[in-house]
Amino acid sequence: MGDMASSTDPAAHNSFSDFNREEMTRLADNVRSLQRTNQDLSARNTKLAEMLKSSRDKLSMMYQQLEDMAQPPSLYGTFLEMSKDGTNAEIFAGGRRMRVAMSPMLCAGDLMPGVQVRLGEGNQILEACDFEQTGDLATLMEMIGRDRALISDRSGEERVVKLAGPLMDRTRKLPRPGDTLLVDRRAGYAFENIPKTEISKLALEEAPDVSYVDIGGLDDQIELIQDAVELPFLHPEMYRSYKLHPPKGVLLYGPPGCGKTLIAKAVANSLSQRIGDAGTSYFINVKGPELLNKYVGETERQIRVIFERARELAGDGRPVIIFFDEMESIFRTRGSGISSDMETTVVPQLLAELDGVEDLSNVIVIGATNREELIDPAILRPGRLDIKIRVQRPNRSGARDIFARYITDAIPLAAPVDELIDTAVDHLFTPRPYVRLTLIDGTVETLNYHDFVSGAMIANIVDRAKKSAIKDHIDGRTTGLSAEHLIHAIDQENQQSEDLPNTSNPDEWTRIIGRQGKRVAEVEVV
C-alpha cells in the first residue's frame, strides 16, 4: 500500500513532466539548429554548383578559343555560278577559277552571281557574305543581252564583264551606256552603278535664284537674250507656224566682271518661273577648266556625258540650259596649242554635240568669255552659237542703275538714296588718268579709272563703304551710309588697282579695255 502511494505522488509526476518539456524543448532547438545548418549547407552547395558551372563554361569557351586559334584562316572568293548538276559551285579565288563543294548548312538561295563567299579548310563554301564594295571604275559602253556589259577604262581598254546580283535586280533599271560601274576585272564582274559624281562635280543642275531685277545697267543685253532664249520656250507654236528654228546657242562676251554669268543665271530662273506648274528648268553650269584632264579622250568623254545628261533632263519637255563659263579655256582655236594641242579633238566633240541638239528645241547652250578671239571660229558660226551678245562696261546711266541695286532704303543711310547714288557716280566718273597707251601708229591715248568700271567693281565699292559705315557706327561717329563713305571707298578701289596693271604685254590692253582698234605698242602707268 505504501509503494502504491508513492507511485501516485503528485510531486514526482510534476517532476517527470518538467523533464519531458525540457527534453522536448532541447530537441526542438536541436532540430531548428540542424535546419539552419542544412539551409546554409544547401545555399553553399548551390553557390558551389553555380561556380562549378561557370568554371566549366569558361573552360569550354577557352577550349573553343584554342580550337579557333588552331584553325587555318578563311579564304574569300567570288561566286560565279552553280555547276550544271547543282551540287557544286563555280568560284573565283586566289586569281583562278575553281569548282568547290558547298556546306550542307548553306542556303543555296543566298548564292547570287558576284557575291563574296567564305571558304573552309578544304575550299568548301561555308557562308555567303556581301557584295564587293571596292574595286576599279569603268564606263559602260553598251549592254550585251541582260547579264553582260562592254566596259572601257580610263586608258581606253575594253572588255566584257558580267553583271552581279544587284545590277540584275528586275525592280531596278539596267545600267545605261555612259554609266560608271564598279568592277572586279579579275573576277569579270560589275557590282554597282556608281552615281555620276563627275557631273555633280562639274555641273549645277538646279535653277539659280538670280533674277533680272538683280542685274543693273544691262537692259539691252537682257532684252536680246530674252528674245533669243525665252521666246522659243514660251511660244513654241509660233515658231512652228513660222517655220523658224530656235537658236542652238548664245555667246556672251565682253570685259570681265560685267554680268555675263549673272545674265545666264537669270535666264534659267526666269524660265523656271514662267513655265510655273509645268515643271522647272535646269541650269547645267559647266566649270570649263575642270573639264581638262591629262588622259587622252577624257575631256571629250565628259563633254559627251554632259550633253547626254542634258538630253535626259529635256526628255520631258523642260527647258535645259548648258552654261560654259570661261569658254576660251577649253574651246580654243584649233592649231593654237603649244603642247598636246588638245583643241583638235575637244572642239570637234563640242561641234558634234551642238549639231546633235538640233532636234531638242528645249536645250540651249550659253557660253561666256572675255577672250572671244581665242574661241575656235567653227563654234561661233551661225547654226551653232547663233546669237552673239556683247556685255559692255557700264556707262554713267548703267553705273547708277547698278548702284541702285545695292544702296536702298533697307539699309541705314545718312542721306537720301538718290543723293548718295549721284555723288558716287559723279566721283566714280570724274576723269583721273590711269594708264597711257602708245598705239602702233604713234598716237597716244590716256585711259582714266572710269574706263575700267564694271558691275563687280561697283559691288565691291559699296561693300567697302558699308564696312566703313559699320566701323564709324561702332565708334559712335556717324549712323548710316554716307557720301563720304562712298567717296573714300572709290578712292580706295582706285588706289589698290594702281599696282595691278600688266605692262609686259601691251597687246593684252586692247582686250582688257574692251575696245577694238589699233594694236598697243607701249603701256605706261600714269
From Swiss-Prot:
Biased composition (Polar residues): 1-18
Pfam families tied to this protein: AAA (PF00004), Prot_ATP_ID_OB_C (PF16450), Prot_ATP_ID_OB_N (PF17758)
Source superkingdom: Bacteria
Residue ranges, annotated region (Disordered): 1-20
Coiled-coil regions listed: 20-59
A GO BP entry: modification-dependent protein catabolic process
HAMAP family linked to this entry: ARC_ATPase (MF_02112)
Record family assignment: Belongs to the AAA ATPase family.
Quaternary structure and partners: Homohexamer. Assembles into a hexameric ring structure.
UniProt name for this protein: AAA ATPase forming ring-shaped complexes
Gene giving rise to this polypeptide: arc
